[in-house]
Amino acid sequence: MAAGSWTCLILAIALLCLPWLQEGSAFPTIPLSWLFNTAVFRAHHLHKLAFDTYPKLEEAYIPKEQKYSFLRNPQTSLCFSESIPTPSNKEETQQKSNLELLHISLLLIQSWLEPVQFLRSVFANHLVHTNSNFDIYLYLKKLEEGIQTLMERLEDGSPRTGQIFKETYSKYDTNSHNDDTLLKNYRLLYCFRKDMNKVETFLRTVRCRAVEGSCGF
């Protein structure tokens, strides 16, 4: 076959295949249920990680007297994320819209992107996961991205919840500069456990509303 004929044949095949290639290049829409299940799983994993690590750190290094004084003192038990208004009970949670709960969850996750790096050594020393390559910061980033995707999918044209003012960790860290590293990590872990529990609760609530048959799962 002449060179010109080969060129025409190749061009014809390419043109015939073009619509198929274009169709195949488009990613199918990810099911909403999968997005929710992934986000809930990640939030649960982070909460469980903190829940399992906290008593081990406490038992190994924190004297009982120091523990009780810490819990009774509103200054030391106050978390830097308290500046983010969150529902304090089930009734208040149910009064929030899906987008509001997702936005609050997003703010809580974002507030931890800086301080969680101080907890890496705590989690590494106190076990819990068998994957030595686990990176808690990257895991938080994945959860942040997942929540942002859910917000985009649930956006119905209603105005987004405005940015809520929150104190930075740097301000909190300055106020606690007299604490030794161990006590500071203890306080951080205490707050991280509380906040991840909130995020998991809020995500489960929204999933229950948005995905049929997912309540209690």
Curated annotation (Swiss-Prot):
GO molecular function: growth factor activity; growth hormone receptor binding; hormone activity
A Pfam family that the UniProt record links to this protein: Hormone_1
Location, primary (coarse class): secreted
Disulfide linkage: 79-191, 208-215
Described function: Plays an important role in growth control. Its major role in stimulating body growth is to stimulate the liver and other tissues to secrete IGF1. It stimulates both the differentiation and proliferation of myoblasts. It also stimulates amino acid uptake and protein synthesis in muscle and other tissues.
Family statement drawn from the similarity comment of this UniProt entry: Belongs to the somatotropin/prolactin family.
Name the record gives this protein: Growth hormone variant
Gene: GH2
